[in-house]
Amino acid sequence: MRRINPNKLELEERVVAVNRVAKVVKGGRRLRFSALVVVGDKNGHVGFGTGKAQEVPEAIRKAIEDAKKNLIEVPIVGTTIPHEVIGHFGAGEIILKPASEGTGVIAGGPARAVLELAGISDILSKSIGSNTPINMVRATFDGLKQLKRAEDVAKLRGKTVEELLG
């Protein structure tokens, strides 16, 4: 998979979660903050990243840098996705279904941020199992990575799109 250059895209960021984490040492607890951020150009490119630091803004900055390194391209057909798909990560699972125009983004929390920043404006989704923000984001990314356009599948099979769709 080729890397996407984040400098050529106008990326928008969205903070999905900020957590206070503690490391217990002999003298007490060492507190730090971890941040989960999703970035996207609302035109088929989206990425997520995590960052950890002693201050919240620094954790968010690190997460944004990380997210720009993990960009993926999402195939979009009109305003929705090409086909139904199920994304898995850990105990989290998400079902993504294409929706007719005007439906809007029907998704909960972390998945909504990913789908909106990817540029998908009509989609139905249902999250099952673990609802931890990081697991939901990773499961959504797993689902989005599985998506393929009809043209790509036809090319792989050596057929025309008409032959595939019958």
Swiss-Prot record:
Q: This protein's superkingdom?
A: Bacteria
The record's section on InterPro entries has:
Ribosomal_Su5_D2-typ_SF, Ribosomal_uS5, Ribosomal_uS5_bac-type, Ribosomal_uS5_C, Ribosomal_uS5_N, Ribosomal_uS5_N_CS, Ribsml_uS5_D2-typ_fold_subgr
Q: Does the keyword Lyase apply?
A: no
**Alphabetically ordered keywords of this record:** Antibiotic resistance, Ribonucleoprotein, Ribosomal protein, RNA-binding, rRNA-binding
Entry-linked Pfam families: Ribosomal_S5, Ribosomal_S5_C
What residues does the S5 DRBM domain cover?
A: 11-74
Q: Per the record, what is one GO cellular component? A: small ribosomal subunit
Q: Which GO terms describe its molecular function?
A: rRNA binding; structural constituent of ribosome
Q: Which PROSITE patterns match?
A: RIBOSOMAL_S5, S5_DSRBD
Give me any GO biological process, just one: translation
Is RNA-binding one of the keywords UniProt gives this record? yes
Q: List the signal peptide residues.
A: none
Q: Which family does it belong to?
A: Belongs to the universal ribosomal protein uS5 family.
Q: What does the subunit comment say? A: Part of the 30S ribosomal subunit. Contacts proteins S4 and S8.
What does this gene product do? With S4 and S12 plays an important role in translational accuracy. Located at the back of the 30S subunit body where it stabilizes the conformation of the head with respect to the body.
| Free-text comment about domains | The N-terminal domain interacts with the head of the 30S subunit; the C-terminal domain interacts with the body and contacts protein S4. The interaction surface between S4 and S5 is involved in control of translational fidelity.
UniProt-recorded name of the protein: Small ribosomal subunit protein uS5
The protein's organism comes out as Geobacillus stearothermophilus
The gene for this chain is rpsE
